[in-house]
Swiss-Prot record:
The keyword GTP-binding does not apply. This is HHIP-like protein 1. Residues 682-785 form the SRCR domain. Its main location: secreted. One of its GO terms (biological process) is cell migration. GO terms for cellular component: extracellular region; membrane.
Amino acid sequence: MAGRRAVARIGPGALLVLRALLAAAHPQCLDFRPPFRPPQPLSFCAQYSAFGCCTAEQDAALARRFRVLETRMDAGVWATCAGYALDLLCQECSPYAAHLYDAEDPATPLRTVPGLCEDYCLDMWQTCRGLFRLLSPDRELWALESNRAKLCRYLSLDDTDYCFPSLLVNENLNSNLGRVVADAKGCLQLCLEEVANGLRNPVAMVHAGDGSHRFFVAEQVGLVWTYLPDRSRLEKPFLNVSQAVLTSPWEGDERGFLGLAFHPRFPHPSKLYVYYSVGVGFREWIRISEFRVSEGDENTVDHGSERIILEIEEPASNHNGGQLLFGDDGFLYIFTGDGGMAGDPFGKFGNAQNKSALLGKVLRIDVDRKERGLHYGIPPDNPFVDDPGARPEVYALGVRNMWRCSFDRGDPMSGTGRGRLFCGDVGQNKYEEVDLVERGRNYGWRAREGFECYDRKLCANTSLDDVLPIFAYPHKLGKSVTGGYVYRGCEYPNLNGLYIFGDFMSGRLMSLRENPETGQWKYSEVCMGRGQTCAFPGLINNYYPYIISFAEDEAGELYFMSTGVPSATAAHGVIYKVIDPSRRAPPGKCKIRPAQVKVRSHLIPFVPKEKFIRTPESTPRPTARAPTKAPRRRRPTAAPPAPTPRPTKPARPTRRPGARKGGGRRRGRPSTAVPEPENGSVRLVRPAGLSPGRGRVEVFIGGRWGTVCDDAWDTKAAAVVCRQLGFAHAVRAAKRAEFGEGRALRILLDDVRCAGSERNLLECAHAGVGTHNCKHDEDAGVECSHQDPNL
């Protein structure tokens, strides 16, 4: 790794310089959070009115302490010592208060007097040594009061860069203070907070916009989970269409449950819309459906309310699109892929350039009315409603496979940017791109990929009239863009207006910021905070490399979802919240008051699993820079290399769950190791032709799969297995090898007795792993269901 090699060459003396440089990026308050800009000027510690760690209330409290000190000192002495008292009291407001008071480590006692530089301490001792006793209850400090050298040693800091008052003139600490920290190469250093884990390819996270501040997380297999503002998860799924969803465990299968969106006036009506893959015989389709929330439980969908709005046949198993969004206009925007395979080979110009095809498009429909024999209405201002050769649903064309789009909420103060539609469009051989989608525009595919021609004849067609992306990057940086969001949240003002996105294959986080004067977009990579930047409670500096999707919560804060194993059945997905360690909003400004929601399901509390890594490796970046604007020649004449043929089977498509295996966290390059199943994982093995949810139970323990004996096997044990597999109900516990004997495996569990609430069979009472008095003709099985068998 480039950064690692650099450190290896630096000697002990130079390493101190490096530490000082790293310290420049680490302002922190005594509450272990970033400093802020007070909403109103401070009257006592006025030097920290622009940026620091005190509110007006805290400033007033320090002023009261100052006045108390004045009453406890002789007037003549106070005239000499008041300046020292002001200096020391106000260091609680310093943007580096955590360093001044040795609060970097929450486990160590907090100083009562800030760390002082030697010269300052010696001068203060000479004239105002009695002030130390009044400032601090520390009796050890009191005992040193008469010994100048020992006292000043006691009040010194190990890191002298932070001692007062030298830190006030330290250029490394004060240049760009309060701005997003960037390294020498311009890589923005941010931190993360783990929000949820144990998810199977989390493809989407959305909120309902109803004031509840719940968020709903969709897994590729077809389950949607409800999370409350305290990050606990409801045990019962919000939605379960896993029996209808077409997907597989293959790493690289792009099919599955791909997107959802709540009606813009939710909960009146209490509708939501979903986007998923289905199979009918040997044909595959994408389906857009409407559901209603259950009248008896606002955290559960009425599964019988499904109304299919639109189905589009997919000629191949990849490039399925998957995004659903409602705009400010109240219309539903649907983002479809070009139908799959390489080079959009369907018809003379491909699906994406064919206005009469719904594939390779951005569609826009009205879900609140029906017309023309359709299950939806056509907005009257759709661009091609009067074109007899076009589908009226088409809003924009020339799309290859837009994976993750978002509407800009607009600047919180001015509203600038509101309604802009950003999309990441996955490329073919050379480029990934970010587009600003507008009504009636053509985004170039398959004529163009990024800024370059892909199909020479189409590219030279004067009627193409395509729009270039706002940004495109070569495959040196990544091979599968994941579109993100423009940050418009409250908590981190420095991020306002920053478009943050990523790449699924390289695990790279990236950002764009628009220059309002030129309209150009500036690219910056996003890195995890180095050194101690993120070393505070609740923050981490690493993530799993396969970036699947981005999200924003109801308050506008930014998240992303990634996994170490890109399979729809691997529970390795994690949701991370993006944190700016350089500056936060003033305390209390972003407080939310969630609307109350009745909870009828058991709650599963959130338990973080990810850890802060103390020596993160820097991320090597290619020397070739990604283009941030179009080349001067609008129409390149040279054709790109012929497209690489792609397999028609969905085992290794160009989009989500990637072609490479691996589960390493993103610090340097992703690891190539594939994690094995967790201890206690289960699977069902069933004879051919048997429906899903029924089969012989096999359990993974100690690195191997094995069977379970049916002694004491009952529906409580079956319920544990079914819940692990994503089913809400256990219909029955099967015995006597009803679903076949697992003779090739060892018998791993016997005499299993469960209460029914355990997370896996290992938590149930049992005879001991590998201990049994049975044969395979007693192999246990289960029958699971998404529906209550008693209804």
